[in-house]
A protein has these predicted regions:
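Basic, flexible linker segments flanking DNA-binding modules
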Residues: 2-103, 198, 259-266
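Generic alpha-helical secondary structure signal
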Residues: 2-6, 22, 149, 179, ...
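RNase H-like polynucleotidyl transferase catalytic core
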Residues: 72-77, 168-171, 186-204, 220-226
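An active-site-proximal beta-strand-loop segment
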Residues: 97-137, 143-144
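Active-site beta-loop-alpha junctions of metal-dependent nucleic acid enzymes
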Residues: 121, 139-161
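Acidic/histidine-rich, metal-coordinating catalytic segments
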Residues: 161-176, 195, 256-257
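C-terminal domain-tail junction helix/linker
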Residues: 178, 185, 189, 211-269
């Protein structure tokens, strides 16, 4: 003889299972907003911002149980030949991989990344990141990499570059052009260039470019050539920059967004 009440009890979900279900829905809502890119640490930080104080172990367990884990970006292997001496007449690697700064506007890093468009061409995005706040402080898109493309990027930095600001890039043709160096000099900035062929010298902004593709483009469009016009790809770049600055919390900033962190430190100074 089987006790009927014990059968019903075994079929009834436990309180823990019910709580997990509710909790999983909260996590799912956050993952949907952030394109499935929040890992355990950032998810825990985001939940706390919403007043939900939980142990990161529970977050990890529920994320795994409900298959809500983040999209993992594969670590890139850097194969770089290192040329220690820059070519004659060019600025050296003044930044020297010191990727931190005490104040906004002290150190800026820049790079151009490219994204495919439906006509077989590319959407080039020129981005500048502040090493203090982690904010993207300039973003320009174009159909080709010209000197003017680089100058337009500098125009966006009006008021953000101060005398002595370090401006670091790789040795791309835009950045080694005398007119670009002169424009920086006129703004009072100190130019710094990566060593030839050494991607690690500009790792922070190169990492951002990879993160943008992994968090924003690939989840929505997959890899390969996308069926989007230049204007559509360009719009997505600007949307990601806004999201990255204003909504995406960062562990190294104490789980604040880049914009929140800048406001906090400028109020304290």
């Amino acid at each position: 003889h089987v006790n009927r009440s014990s059968v019903y009890k075994s079929l009834k979900p436990s309180q823990r299972a019910l709580d997990d279900e509710v909790f999983a829905q909260q996590i799912k809502a956050i993952q949907l907003k952030h394109k499935g890119c929040y890992g355990v640490d950032r998810m825990t930080g985001e939940l706390r911002r919403k007043g939900i104080y939980v142990n990161h172990k529970r977050v990890a367990r529920v994320m795994k149980l409900y298959k809500l884990n983040a999209i993992i970006r594969k670590k890139r292997n850097y194969f770089c030949d290192v040329e220690q001496v820059p070519r004659k007449g060019l600025p050296g690697n003044v930044l020297n991989r010191k990727f931190s700064a005490e104040k906004p506007g002290k150190k800026l890093v820049s790079d151009v990344t490219y994204l495919p468009t439906s006509d077989g061409q590319w959407c080039y995005a020129s981005l500048v990141k502040d090493l203090c706040t982690s904010e993207i402080v300039a973003c320009v898109t174009g159909k080709s990499q010209t000197l003017n493309f680089g100058i337009e990027t500098l125009k966006q930095l009006d008021g953000k570059i101060h005398p002595g600001t370090l401006f670091h890039t790789d040795q791309g043709s835009i950045y080694t052009h005398p007119a670009f160096s002169y424009a920086l000099e006129k703004m009072g900035a100190v130019q710094s260039l990566s060593r030839k062929g050494n991607c690690l010298d500009n790792a922070v902004i190169e990492s951002f470019n990879g993160t943008m593709k992994c968090e924003w483009f690939y989840p929505q469009l997959g890899k390969g050539r996308w069926n989007l016009s230049f204007e559509e790809v360009s719009k997505m770049v600007f949307e990601y920059v806004k999201y990255y600055n204003e909504e995406r919390i960062q562990k190294k900033l104490g789980y604040l967004t880049a914009t929140e962190y800048r406001r906090q430190i400028t109020q304290n100074h």
